[in-house]
């Protein structure tokens, strides 16, 4: 499993972030933050797994990418682990508590069609997406990487 995970992470060169975090108690970002555009490379050092390198597209999900790049630059993710692994489906990380209940200080709007945002991205193998609770706008810092096509998400 660990080797397969490393191979998946190495092969993941172009990753897309679509909106979605399992954070339930957090403050909504109230200030107007300038959103990014274009592609960005991010690097996250995951405890016990190594470094993830990903390219994310701010033109498709500007709020999500702006948040992810900010957290990555702040080294928020470094040293965290994957707290949820479902073999053949996905791996989830980005929780400072390590149990699926934590996140960063702010939540962001989910950038996906069910939330009124035109977004052509699909959860295909290697896609990086934000985890969220039932609230469409609850994404924070938790993310997941799909291990196989999961276009029903």
Residue ranges of predicted features:
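N-terminal secretory signal peptides that target proteins for export/translocation
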Residues: 1-2
């Amino acid at each position: 499993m660990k080797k397969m995970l490393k191979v998946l992470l190495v092969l993941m060169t172009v990753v897309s972030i679509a909106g979605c975090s399992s954070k339930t108690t957090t403050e909504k970002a109230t200030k107007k933050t300038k959103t990014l555009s274009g592609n960005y490379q991010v690097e996250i050092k995951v405890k016990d797994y190594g470094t993830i390198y990903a390219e994310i597209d701010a033109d498709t999900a500007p709020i999500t990418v702006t948040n992810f790049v900010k957290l990555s630059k702040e080294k928020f993710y470094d040293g965290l682990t994957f707290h949820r692994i479902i073999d053949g489906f996905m791996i989830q990380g980005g929780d400072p508590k390590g149990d699926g209940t934590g996140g960063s200080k702010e939540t962001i709007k989910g950038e996906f069609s069910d939330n009124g945002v035109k977004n052509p991205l699909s959860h295909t193998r290697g896609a990086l997406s934000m985890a969220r609770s039932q609230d469409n706008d609850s994404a924070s810092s938790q993310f997941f990487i799909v291990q196989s096509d999961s276009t029903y998400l």
